[in-house]
């Protein structure tokens, strides 16, 4: 039996990540990696702006109900993203300025919050 219930959000998430990547690339950021997963957290996008490394969380909502994508990031999710980024920085021996951005997509609107947390 196929469980499409869990597949639909993943497809939306992947579409949102692709939109976010293109949006940021159009604004001069350089793509490094996507969907970096560790057992304790995931990084949706990693990009660079010059020498600065940017770890990006992408939130996509097809409707703006319940606060929309801008309000969809929990403190627990922020903690998991930070742990994943710290691990990525250590294993890749990155010695540079880093920041955490949020891309929130509600239907067709994209909101970019640099240094979101």
Swiss-Prot record:
One Pfam match, given by its short name, reads UPF0102
What is a single molecular function from GO for this protein?
nucleic acid binding
- List the InterPro entries hit by this protein, alphabetically: Restrct_endonuc-II-like (IPR011335), tRNA_endonuc-like_dom_sf (IPR011856), UPF0102_YraN-like (IPR003509)
Look up the signal peptide feature and give its range.
Answer: none
Per the database entry, which stretches of residues form a coiled coil? none
Q: Which family does it belong to?
A: Belongs to the UPF0102 family.
Q: Which PANTHER family match?
A: UPF0102 PROTEIN YRAN
> Any idea what this protein is called?
UPF0102 protein Swoo_0351
Organism expressing this protein natively:
Shewanella woodyi (strain ATCC 51908 / MS32)
